[in-house]
């Protein structure tokens, strides 16, 4: 028996890293989990490796209608939604004077607009059940967790676009918490620091991802990785499992 038996969770960007660790933890506690990733093969593999009940929605969540389709996949699979973790994201780093409009907009799209669209699409599936439960004298809580970053709370040189997107998600979180508290929806943001994922791995030719047919370089230079680790009280980055709360 898990504390999440019978619950349904959507975790975006959940085929790797923090998202996967979160999906695994939710599944271990009894939740059915919708896995999402740009890469359908990786998403299917992750779903097959998670012991609990899963479904998959593969695709670019910034595409028109994708967030609605993501939510509908969860409804078609299980008929309800209890938990949403807005985790999907990546980085395109550059100093401000060399950053293109496109690079700036893409970070806002994935880190702020996609969570907004997912939440908006899920609204009737979170609010309407709560209205009925309130009439019946029940108190059932649902959860939304938006993944931010210390880049959004403190800023980070070379990441004006990412920092802006991650700062905006904090404002969205606070606003939604005030709007949906009456429906017993707890809305929180988690601002991670240095977690060992492919976004913080060594910056080399092999560490790339494809977005919209374009290869995007991921990672940070080894010198900066070493400097960052020195600033962490533990003396090392966090792991995806620690970030997930396991």
Language-model-derived ranges and their functions:
Residues 124, 178-182:
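Alpha-helical segment proximal to the catalytic Tyr-Lys
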Residues 97, 154-160, 182-183, 235, ...:
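Active-site loop immediately N-terminal to the catalytic Tyr-X3-Lys motif
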Residues 119, 165, 173:
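Active-site helix of classical SDR
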Residues 149:
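Residue(s) in the substrate-gating loop at a strand-loop-helix junction
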Residues 182, 194-231:
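A glycine/serine/threonine-rich, flexible loop-to-helix segment
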Residues 95-96, 103-108, 228:
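Substrate-binding pocket helix/loop in short-chain dehydrogenase/reductase
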Residues 2-34:
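Canonical Rossmann dinucleotide-binding motif of NAD(H)/NADP(H)-dependent dehydrogenases/reductases
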């Amino acid at each position: 028996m898990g504390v999440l038996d019978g619950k349904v969770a959507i975790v975006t960007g959940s085929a790797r890293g923090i998202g996967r660790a979160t999906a695994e933890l939710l599944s271990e506690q009894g939740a059915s989990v919708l896995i999402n990733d740009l890469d359908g093969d990786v998403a299917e593999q992750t779903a097959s490796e998670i012991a609990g009940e899963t479904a998959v929605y593969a695709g670019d969540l910034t595409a028109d209608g994708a967030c609605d389709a993501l939510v509908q996949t969860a409804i078609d699979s299980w008929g309800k939604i209890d938990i949403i973790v807005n985790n999907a994201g990546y980085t395109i780093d550059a100093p401000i004077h060399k950053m293109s409009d496109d690079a700036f907009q893409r970070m806002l799209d994935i880190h702020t607009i996609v969570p907004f669209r997912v939440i908006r699409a899920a609204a009737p599936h979170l609010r309407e059940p709560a209205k009925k439960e309130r009439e019946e004298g029940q108190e059932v809580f649902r959860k939304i967790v938006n993944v931010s970053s210390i880049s959004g709370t403190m800023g980070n040189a070379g990441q004006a676009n990412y920092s802006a997107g991650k700062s905006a998600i904090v404002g969205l979180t606070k606003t939604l918490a005030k709007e949906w508290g009456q429906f017993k929806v707890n809305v929180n943001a988690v601002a991670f620091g240095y977690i060992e994922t492919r976004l913080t791995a060594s910056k080399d030719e092999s560490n790339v991802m494809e977005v919209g047919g374009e290869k995007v370089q991921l990672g940070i230079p080894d010198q900066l990785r070493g400097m960052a680790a020195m600033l962490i009280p533990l003396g090392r980055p966090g792991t995806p499992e620690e970030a997930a709360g396991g």
